Structures are given as C-alpha cells and as structure tokens.
C-alpha cells in the first residue's frame, strides 16, 4: 500500500481480492501515443515494452488485452467499489480500407463498456463527459472551408463509472463526516458535463509524459466515490496524477506503471504533496 509497482497490471497478485475501494485510470491509447518516448513524442527513453497494450496491431486485440486488466480490477475491488475509466474518442487514419474517407473514429468508451458489461459482473453506474476547455490548437480541417466533410474538433472525453455489486463497508461516523462534500462540490461534481482544462506547463509531468490527466478528474472521482483512508488504485499510473491526488486527499494509493522511466516524475509528484493536505479545501 502507498507504493507503485513497475510492471504490467495484467496480473496484480500483490493486491488481495476485494481490498480496493476505488480505481481511477486512463488506459494507453491504441497506436496513437508512444509511451516509450517523452511528452513531445520526440526523444525515446526506452524500447517499447512487449506488454504495452497500446502497441497491439489490431483494435480487437487492444480491447481484448484491456479486458484482462478490467477483470483484475473486478477481482481486487471491494463490494460497492467503483471503477472510473477515462478515454477519448480516437480519430484514426485509415490505411487499409478502400473507401472515400481517410479516417475512422474508434469509440473506445463504447468498446470498453461492451467488453466489461459482457465479460464481468460489474454494473454501469454513471457516465461523465469531460469538456476540455482549452483543447489543442491542432485543428481537424476535413473539407474546410467547403461543406459535406467537416470533421468535429476532438474536444471531449468520457469518464465511465462501473460498480461492483455488494454492500459498502461500514465507515466510522467521524471518517464519513471528514470525507463529506460541500453543497457546492456536490452540485458541481454530479453534473454530467465537467468543464476542465487540459494540463499545462505547471504540471510536473509536462513534456515528460504524452497523456497527462488533469488533477481535477481524480479529485472529483475520489471525493465522490471514496472516504478518507480508503485505497485508490491506478493500474495505468502514467505520470502519477491519480496517486498524487489520492495522497493529498488522505487516501491510500497503489499504482502500476509499465515504464520505469516515469519513476522520477511519479516520485516528484508524490513528494510534492503532504498526506491529507487538500482535506481543508472545502
């Protein structure tokens, strides 16, 4: 507990059955991001790990490989535990189809949802839409400026919440009170559209990791779905954002990260906060 394992999360034998209260993660993108390179996707810091789920040759293999992790998440989740998965729509260039269009949309959220609901006993609890309020200036032009084949700008992502069946554990009254949300937080966090900017240069991982999760996403999920001293897991730790926020909210954390090159930035993030320092934010 309160550690990071630098290995694949396909087998999380370090974690006992039914011991994790909340899982928050964003899985590797399919054939879009190279996690063996820096945040600018220029300098390579290591070879591509053979267990990198984002490097599979077909989309079907990618979704199947992710399911192995989701089944492990189901195993380690406590009764009434939540699994929060953040993914975007993924525009892909068509290279192998003889069509008039040169791109296709991979609806990763839908594919993962179907895979989980068909192959596990988890239930779909909620779906939030992350509206990236300061999206990239890299525009998708399509047939611009002429009609018929405009491409929508990719400015949203999804946070899908699954729940494991069962009664929640008994939580002492003082812990429940200390973990409570303000009325303002409750009203804001339960809206299905979350207006949150993407991370900028103020994030310690900027330029070091190519897919940084904004701290506000795990902050809201942790406040909504866990109490102080609960265990929060991220099976695709990346730059360590989820773990940092969990620590600052007085939760325990466990992370799995395939690329050890990210150890330094993960340690920097974890060392930049004190346990429970955000509990006085409300």
Locate predicted features.
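Core catalytic lobe of class I
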Residues: 1-265
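Short, flexible loop/turn segments with low-complexity composition
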Residues: 173-177, 277-282
